[in-house]
A protein has these predicted regions:
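Radical SAM [4Fe-4S] cluster-binding motif and immediate context
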Residues: 2-167
Length: 167
């Protein structure tokens, strides 16, 4: 867990300028549940910065939700922006985080301003995300051209899966 007690948290919260300009509540902060990405998109710096699939790391769902609970109880946080490169990339880990938020009945809203691994989403997961407080998913669809996505930027995204998820 980050040493937020060493930061002027009230100043950050008062400024209320999270990663995304879209917020529902007033006491917003950022956190991460994972680090890196296993996709090898040509344009993305995540692989260069964090390393590829072999360096991709997820945090324990319990520790992620412990941190959320700590933020609620200590700082009065009521909204989280997950700044992961791909919050849903490890679907099992993502589901366990959601299950734990739901189990603890945490009153938290959250979003994924950096984007989300669309290829890991299905209707059931989206419904569970909403139940756990999600109000915004950012779909990182850099092109509407399937060939360009796969061959030029090397993004493992099947465009035919996107529209049904939005409906």
């Amino acid at each position: 867990m980050p040493a937020r007690h060493l930061l002027p948290m009230e100043k950050y919260i008062k400024i209320n300028k999270p990663h995304s300009p879209f917020t529902l509540r007033k006491r917003v902060t950022q956190m991460v549940a994972s680090r890196g990405c296993s996709a090898k998109c040509y344009f993305c710096t995540s692989v260069l910065f964090w390393g590829g699939a072999e360096q991709y790391r997820v945090r324990s769902p319990k520790l992620v939700v412990d941190e959320i609970e700590h933020l609620i109880n200590v700082y009065g946080i009521d909204e989280i922006h997950f700044d992961d490169d791909n919050f849903s990339l490890n679907k099992k880990n993502c589901e366990e985080i959601l299950d734990e938020i739901i189990r603890r009945k945490l009153d938290i809203k959250w979003a994924t301003p950096n984007g989300i691994a669309v290829w890991a989403l299905d209707q059931k997961l989206i419904e569970k995300m909403a139940q756990a407080g999600c109000y915004q998913l950012t779909f990182a669809v850099e092109s509407g051209n399937q060939e360009f996505l796969l061959k030029t930027i090397k993004k493992p995204l099947n465009l035919s899966r996107v529209k049904p998820l939005l409906d």
